Amino acid sequence: MMNEMTAKRKLKRPEILAPAGTLEKLKTAIHYGADAVYIGGNAYGLRSRAGNFTYEEMAEGVAFAKEHDAKVYVAANMVTHEGNEEGAGEFFRSLRDVGISAVIVSDPALIEICATEAPGLPIHLSTQASATNFETLEFWKEEGLERVVLAREVSMEEVAEIRKNTDIEIEAFIHGAMCISYSGRCTLSNHMSMRDANRGGCSQSCRWKYGLFDMPFGQERNSLTDTGEIEEEFSMSAVDMSMIEHIPELIENGVDSFKIEGRMKSIHYVSTVSNVYKAAVDSYMEDPENYVCKQEWIDELWKVAQRELATGFYYNTPTENEQLFGERRKIPVYKFVGEVLSYDEATQIATIRQRNLFSVGDEIEFYGPGFSHFSQTVEIMHNEEGESIDRAPNPMMVLAMPVAQPVKPGDMIRKRK
């Protein structure tokens, strides 16, 4: 299985890098196995709606990460226009002083400011910079960067070639949404919603539904949906990426960090995906020669899938089968309904915070770090006043219920939609 390049060097366990749009997601990702998380600060990022961190939240997140031997990176990967860089030096110094492990940047102006104004703060090149060959990585290495996040358009063959010719750290996306534009450089939102996607304002215009017509505007025209030529309105977005079945190739070709997309997604998603990739990496590193991708890992990822899954550009250029142009296959997603706050071993009662509606009679599944899964039917529930209830309808309400097996704080609860 291992190629000649791998045989010449000791296999390195890749970092599992998870998204964390909030402090809660940061703690969840680390609890479920992430070695590092990436977050957004209050400026210079590309996810203005991701619940970006204050400096106080960063400090708490960094302290939590250090307690668990994990790292925190900050994405500051916007494309700057004139005046946008004002205050960047102070921003980067604050990140360094709060203990951030690295900053993820794409704009050369911000890279220069960070290197000059905040020496000692490691810099990682963002995927927005579209690094696709080893000469580019060598250039950024000479500029003092410690890591490059490869463009999502890089193939597995190119990953291997890049690793053969440079020793700078390589980070690559292995799971999550795929931008339809080149490495995220998109201007659709600028035209459609007057928001600059390259400065944090992406409104996901590619995922909107568009009407298709047989003639331009201003002429007599017919909707192709109305005429029956197409079944659904048109969108131009890609299916999501999942590389769970290709862990050996990623490790053997020298990818140092496995990046999971999704700072705006839920703790259900973050916990599940982090848990799966940790299990897969641990299994491979324990016994590379006898490694097998388990079906339960694949099934688990489908429980949080929002779209169909494919391998992006790693093995070929995506065809129409990897694009969401029209009708979508129904995905067997689950609904996140709660999290465990505490558990009383004597009474076998769990205290739960509700996240979505569930009721007596529902079949629910508990899961925690390390694939400690079990299912049961909800038979009894009580609210905080001790009153018996049939439903848990109120967002974030706290309730108690008996559980079939011991659970721990931080365990999640879901049910099939």
Where in this protein do the model-derived segments appear?
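Surface-exposed amphipathic alpha-helical tracts and adjacent flexible/coil segments at the periphery
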Residues: M2-Y32, A36-A43, G61-V62, H68-R96, ...
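Gly/Gly-Pro- and Ser/Thr-rich, intrinsically disordered tail segments characteristic of DNA damage-repair
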Residues: E86, G120-L121, L125-F134
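Glycine-rich, positively charged N-terminal anion/phosphate-binding segment
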Residues: R47-K66
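Alpha-helix capping/helix-boundary segments
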Residues: A109-L110
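Histidine/lysine/aspartate-rich catalytic loop segments that bind and position anionic ligands
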Residues: I113
